[in-house]
């Protein structure tokens, strides 16, 4: 096929698809580098007291355009008064990956809820969605690197977002757990001990 035969709409579609693929590859390389550095202990987690509500609003802002485009809702629930000793950039990266995962596995009209609360010795952050849910066979494998479910052929992904989130959360002495019901949605719960403050 000669270049002159291409319709402008075909060229634009090809350019858009190429750009999406390049973004996906760049994200893969960046995530691989981050995980490798975390594994090697070459990343210094610089912790400061950070306001959780401010962090969650930043995450909401980061995904607001995508959520609008996909006609999905991002909902925040939690008090303005909770702070956590953490590396804001790294923890935001971890929660970003979880929210992105929720957006990837929800449909038009679905909602993603980010909630946070404080207990006597921990801060808890949850990301809930009412999407397709995680198949029971996959639930114990979702934090493994490069794991791709045979049940999620309709969504692209490399299988690094959730393992990276887990590594970052563990670098903050936190724990992440996932619970899901097929066809009803998933809940990712992160707990960070605060008793050592």
Q: What kind of feature is each model-predicted range?
A:
Residues 46-49, 68, 73-83:
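Conserved catalytic submotifs in the C-terminal HATPase_c
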Residues 20-25:
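Short alpha-helical segment of the dimerization/phosphotransfer core of two-component systems
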Residues 134-146:
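Short conserved segment of the HATPase_c
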Residues 129:
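Acidic ATP/Mg2+-coordinating residue in the GHKL
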Residues 173-174:
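Conserved glycine-rich
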Residues 109-121:
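Short beta-strand/loop element within the Bergerat-fold HATPase_c
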Residues 10, 40-45, 83-86:
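Conserved micro-motifs of the catalytic ATP-binding
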């Amino acid at each position: 096929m000669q270049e002159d035969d291409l319709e402008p709409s075909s060229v634009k579609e090809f350019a858009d698809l190429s750009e999406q693929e390049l973004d996906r590859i760049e994200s893969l390389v960046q995530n691989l580098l981050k995980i490798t550095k975390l594994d090697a202990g070459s990343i210094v987690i610089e912790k400061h007291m950070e306001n959780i509500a401010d962090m969650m609003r930043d995450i909401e802002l980061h995904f607001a355009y995508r959520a609008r485009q996909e006609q999905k809702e991002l909902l925040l629930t939690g008090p303005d008064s909770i702070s956590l000793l953490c590396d804001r950039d790294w923890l935001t990266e971890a929660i970003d990956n979880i929210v992105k995962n929720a957006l990837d596995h929800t449909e038009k009209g679905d909602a993603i809820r980010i909630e946070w609360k404080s207990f006597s010795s921990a801060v808890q952050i949850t990301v809930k969605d009412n999407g397709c849910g995680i198949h029971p066979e996959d639930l114990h494998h979702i934090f493994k690197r490069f794991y791709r479910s045979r049940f999620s052929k309709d969504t692209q992904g490399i299988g690094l977002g959730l393992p990276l989130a887990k590594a970052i959360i563990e670098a903050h002495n936190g724990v992440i757990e996932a619970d899901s019901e097929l066809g009803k949605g998933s809940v990712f719960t992160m707990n960070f001990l605060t008793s050592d403050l």
